[in-house]
Amino acid sequence: MLVTAQWLAAHLEDPDLVVVDLRWDEEGRGRARYEEGHVPGARFLDWATDLVDPDHELAFMLADPERFAAALERSGISDHSVVVAYADAGHSGPFRLWWGCGVYGHPDQICILDGGLEAWVGEGHALSGDVPNEPEGSWTPRPGTDLTATRADVLATRDDENAVLLDSREPDKFRGTTVWFETGAIAADADGVASTPRGSLRAGRVPWAVSVPWSRLYGPDLRMRSREELSALFASVGAAPGRRAITYCGVGISASALLYALKRAGIEQAALYDAGWDEWGRDPELPVARGG
């Protein structure tokens, strides 16, 4: 669930509460920014290294259950913990943690600070530079809910009247002028191909996908929109309770926030295509659309 800065301040001393800072930026300064100041008692968790499979051929794929559990345990998280995750407002790392916990059988464990660290500071709460020295937790992965979609699942949505495929990337990536890369967007050439440090990647989108940029999930204050507002947004793109939805982005990060928003709006038959554009754009056998 989403929690407010006021709620977090009132529960900061609860014995089962664990606060995790998932800030990340293209310059790799997440940990340094954490050390400069964070919610008192928060531990730092780097989703881009701690929660991913370092040996997978695709970037940022979800870690296996053992590696994922070890990362949570290093952050002091146990099965009984109430976890509040935050990042910069509008950033999707906390939603990635929420999704991973759901995949591994803890769908209700993660609370997300609505409005991010900006909400905490904006309401007058102090930051701390102290790094807590707390014991490790004990977190048990178990069979989870069906929150993951494959390439085959995405292909199956093409002719399914009861399914919709949603793309959470920014408009330039949906149109195919750039592709996402962790150090910054990379422009595509005249043939619609971007040269990335991991090789060539076609730009564009799955042809039948509908654009729902992650920024539309938030109000002007970068707090997530209400259930009613999200329901109206999703209805406008053909997503509604009783229909299946699959979300994707570049590597499954902003698509995690979109998945969360779908669930918040009561659309339960929803899953994340984790491989995302990093897989789709590299396979010449898969269709791609550009422009629009």
Regions found by a protein language model. Name each.
Residues A5-R33:
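Hydrophobic alpha-helical membrane-insertion signals
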Residues C249:
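Short cysteine clusters
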